[in-house]
């Protein structure tokens, strides 16, 4: 009986934690969307971070528009799904993809080394630029872009995951916000938006 009660308690705790993290993430996601729609303190800005080849990536040094996503290499679901979408966008753009910088910025700088990011992104598309930095550098960029992220311990394991905003941003070469794309937006619609900007 005691074992059964303990088992039920663990199941309940797991369900409660899952629901809490989902609702919390959904709340934060809606927050950035409301901020964009109200045009109040739009996300955006330049950044100077370490690229997956060990060099320095300065967003000011490029005249390309940016397709920007914040995630981490240990992410079990949303990051791989979004990076597959980004790879599809690049392929659909064809030669026009040369006019954009598809960028992945880690929100887990403690684990996401240059090597880890390079190997991880290699599974999706060679054109995706992976960036990392110190925690303070990542905090600064995340704040500028209105991206929340927080470590969450994994119950029963000496490990953690990272809850984070699941949105793709589109910005011009000045780092100014253009648009955002939540998960439900199909890649073909994002490609259309990018082409409209490129061909203006």
Regions found by a protein language model. Name each.
Residues 44-45, 65-66, 165-167:
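Short loop/turn microsegments at loop-to-beta-strand junctions
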Residues 1-46, 200:
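N-terminal targeting signals for export/organelle localization
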Residues 193-200:
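C-terminal alpha-helix
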Residues 137-193:
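Thiol/disulfide oxidoreductase modules built on the thioredoxin-like
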Residues 59-82, 86:
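Short active-site neighborhood of thiol/selenol oxidoreductases, capturing the structured segment around
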Residues 83-141:
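Structural microenvironment flanking redox-active thiols in thiol-disulfide oxidoreductases
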Residues 47-66, 93:
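A short beta-strand-turn-helix
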């Amino acid at each position: 009986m005691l074992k059964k009660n303990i088992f039920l308690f663990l199941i309940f705790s797991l369900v409660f934690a899952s629901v809490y993290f989902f609702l919390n993430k959904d709340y934060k996601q809606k927050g950035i969307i409301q901020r964009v729609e109200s045009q109040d303190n739009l996300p955006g800005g330049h950044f100077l971070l370490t690229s997956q080849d060990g060099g320095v990536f300065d967003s000011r040094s490029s005249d390309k528009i940016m397709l920007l996503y914040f995630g981490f290499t240990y992410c079990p679901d949303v990051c791989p799904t979004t990076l597959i979408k980004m790879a599809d966008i690049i392929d659909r753009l064809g030669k026009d993809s040369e006019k954009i910088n598809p960028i992945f910025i880690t929100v887990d700088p403690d684990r996401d080394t240059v090597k880890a990011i390079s190997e991880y992104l290699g599974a999706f598309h060679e054109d995706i630029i992976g960036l990392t930095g110190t925690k303070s550098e990542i905090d600064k960029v995340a704040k500028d872009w209105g991206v929340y992220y927080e470590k969450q311990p994994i119950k029963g394991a000496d490990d953690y995951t990272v809850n984070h905003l699941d949105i793709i941003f589109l910005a011009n070469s000045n780092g100014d916000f253009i648009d955002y794309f939540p998960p439900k937006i199909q890649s073909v619609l994002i490609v259309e938006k990018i082409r409209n900007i490129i061909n203006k």
